[in-house]
Amino acid sequence: MSSSEEADLLRLEEVFSTTLARTISLILQPLLLADPEPSDPCGKECLRLLQQLHESAQRLWYVTEQSLLSLRQRLYHPPSKGLEAVLLLSNADHVLQAHMEYIKSYTDCVVAQAFQKVSKKRSEFWRSQRKALRQLLSSGSSEGSVGTTMCQALRQPLSQHVQKYLLLLLSLRDTLDESHPAQELVMHAITLFGNLQSFMGQALDQAVATQALWHSLSSRLRDVLCSPAHRLLQDSQDIPVVVTPLRAERVLLFDDSLVLLQGHNTHTFDLKLVWVKPGQDKCVLHILTPEEEISFCTRDPQGQVVWQWKVTQAVCQALCGKKDFPVLGSGRETSVPPECRCVAYTFCREGRLCQATYDGEWCRAKPHGKGTLKWPDGRNHVGTFYQGLEHGFGICLVPQASEDKFDCYKCHWREGRMCEYGICEYGTDEVYKGYFQAGLRHGFGILESAPQAPQPFRYTGHWERGQRSGYGIEEDRDRGERYIGMWQADQRHGPGVVVTQAGVCYQGTFQGDKMAGPGILLCEDDSLYEGTFTRDLTLLGKGKVTFPNGFTLDGSFSSGTDKGLYTQGVLDTAALPPDPSSTRKRQLGLGTFPVESRWQGVYSPFRDFLRLGCPGEQQEALLGFHTQSSRELRKSQECLCCERSHPEDCVGSMEDTLKELLQHRKPKALQQYLRKALSNSRHPLGQLLRTLMLTFQATYSGIGANKHLQEMAQEEVKQHARELWAAYRGLLKVALQHQGQTLEEENMETRDLQVHGLLLPLILPSFYSELFTLYLLLHEREDGLYSRGITNLSLFPDTKLLEFLDVQKHLWPLKDLKLTSNQRYSLVRDKCFLTATECLQKIITTVHPREKLEVLEKTYGEIEATVSRVLGCKYKLPMDDLLPLLIYVVSRARIQHLGAEIHLIRDMMDPVHTGGLHDFLLTALESCYEHIQKEDMRPHHLPGHWDARDLW
């Protein structure tokens, strides 16, 4: 059954609905018609505010009608409609929102004095309506102007209505049992409308105070500050403060900004970017803003408390966008604004950030966290900031003078400058991938021009303070040459080796980008010059030429006017031919560039990573990252994105990596782990290996594929294996430290065993292509002789070849030969020792020397097995029997470039095999290789009693 309170609510809503309708028709509609098409800005603003008030009044009337309808249904049909169906209870937030919108629109008009300004345009009409306006007021009378009466008529009915709402709801609550279904709804409505009553009184007071403020300001200040949305919260004329260092005459705290007045000038601070910090003195309050730090000094601590409380609450209100203040001293819990915020701001003060707009996270008035910084000239920086400076990963876009050209920096930053690893794509189409320090290239890095550049180049090496310095490789594609050596101040300086596309290479000392003093020049025809010469390889000054045939020319050289070469010296034609190892196989760079110090710029960041304890958030900064080139995207600001692993992912993955590493310490498990790690581009070891591969390719591939660099390359691969093992040990040490354990010391013998036996086989495939090419070039002559010998021996049928090689007949595997009816043993070809031959052919399918030696051992086993089967008993081959049989198998296997294979095995094999079976078999294979090259393997050296027809 409905109560008397519900009936009172119904009557209250009926009265308020009628009052609202009369207010709309008597006041708001005539106000809109007073000047429907104003021409001045002030008139247009007043019309906009009145239209907004009219719309909010109509919405409030509509909500009141809905509430009235729900009350009628409740009173006239109580069994079917419970109390909880009443709109005022079931949807109290909706009702509250309509009231809030009306209050906002009304106070905007009060602040802008819209009623007074518009009413003056139809003053006669409004004077005639004074009596009707007074009837809307509860007292029935009103003193003051028409504008004042109008304000009261629009405000008083609402204030009284909300007050009566609250009283009736309180009375209704008392009539309900605690278990009543609507009890909770009633309590919620009481809370909402209690807050509304407080808010309304505060909002009206603020609007009146703000309206009064405009009269106390000069016209210039009023034009700057006057806004319908402004609400004055505190004035220093009420509670005086002394401001330093700006020396403001007056301080105004609005709901969205803090304003300092200095004569006709204003300093306005957005409250979203204001931080409040109490001073040590109880009368001092510090205000932090993006570009100013100011202090308020009050006369007494009470004044400081008021200012601190009001500024703090104003900041909270600005951040949450709600004008909902508790009354000072009401006992409500004071809100505390967050230290970290996300706001946009444009810097004004002269300096690096002048006119730049920062949009992102802040902390204590400084950009801090993720954000975007944009300048009017088109510069952009997207990334992380720390205490106001770029810090961490960021992408910076810098426009060039030419249209649609940008420099794009994808780098790590520290204290506002590029630091550690980054990728920079310049408007010139050059790309730099490497390390920085203090905004300059520093450490290891690769700078490469666009392929279509007029003078294409690529530099791979070390930098110091933005200049090439230390060991580095530069490829000049226009000249077709590659420089391998030392640099200083962006110039070739110190020892260096130059390799040309034509196959010529020379070594000397450079100073100021030019050769200084004598050098060594090796030509493609294996002639050697020792002396002074120019960069274009013109012999100049004293020197000595050693020709391939052994002749020497010692004297002085100069160039003639007709581009000829003039010399004055001694030609010695009686000299013996030089040792091939002194000219054709002469190696450059050995001892000149100690292998331990060549790529310190690659190893150093990894060591720093280990020294810091392998922090995941520092992995890509120290070890690098890879992104797709955005050369096309750089033409627009769309390139402010980067395809790289998320830094948060690196933190977790690094911890997992260290844990996994501890689980794979046994030999077999360790081998599997290292194979997986080295093939993973995100694993620290995999990242290091990929960088080392880049340096190796930059040095020895393409133009650098020169036989005179073979030893330099093979010692570099071994050094990389040693460094990678040290890197693994470093990771293991950190992983153990995380577990509170220590890593046992490792002696040199154990280290060498692990490097050659474990790690070198795993990394050699990464360098094999370039390394084996150097072996091919170095042993090209011997392999040519060997190839001709193989061709000659292939003319023999099997039995003739066995006979020619002096293989004892009782060892011939004739039982393995299956002849057709018209075949003879003497005609069979490529059938004897077939399993051994097929086994040896697999040597070219393997990479590591250990695997190649295992193939050789299996081949030896197949030869012995075949002989044992022929003899019908187990038979161990003596060297006298083995060599002819091995020559036979080698000739039938027809392995190309066997010399390169043998020397690679010899140079890269594990020292543990020295003196063992593998060493013995490799020596035997070398003997076969050398024997096949001999003159007696040529057709004209075959036994005279052999007719060529007999070979078939």
Swiss-Prot record:
From the broadest rank down, the organism's phylogenetic lineage runs: Eukaryota, Metazoa, Chordata, Craniata, Vertebrata
Which compartments does it reside in? Cytoplasm
Record SUPFAM superfamilies: DBL homology domain (DH-domain) (SSF48065), Histone H3 K4-specific methyltransferase SET7/9 N-terminal domain (SSF82185), VPS9 domain (SSF109993)
Q: What's the stated role of this polypeptide?
A: Acts as a guanine nucleotide exchange factor (GEF) for Rab5 GTPase. Regulates the ALS2-mediated endosome dynamics.
Q: Where are the MORN repeats?
A: 358-380, 381-403, 409-431, 432-454, 459-481, 483-505, 506-528, 529-552
Q: What is its main location?
A: cytoplasm
Q: Does the keyword Cytoplasm apply?
A: yes
- What is an example of a GO molecular function annotated in this UniProt entry? small GTPase binding
Outline the extent of the VPS9 domain: 795-941
What name is this protein filed under? ALS2 C-terminal-like protein
Entry comment describing in which tissues the protein is expressed: Expressed in heart, lung, liver and kidney.
Q: Does the keyword Ribosomal protein apply?
A: no
**What's the source species for this entry?**
Mus musculus (Mouse)
Q: How does it assemble?
A: Homodimer. Forms a heteromeric complex with ALS2. Interacts with ALS2 and RAB5A.
Q: Which UniProt keywords apply?
A: Cytoplasm, GTPase activation, Repeat
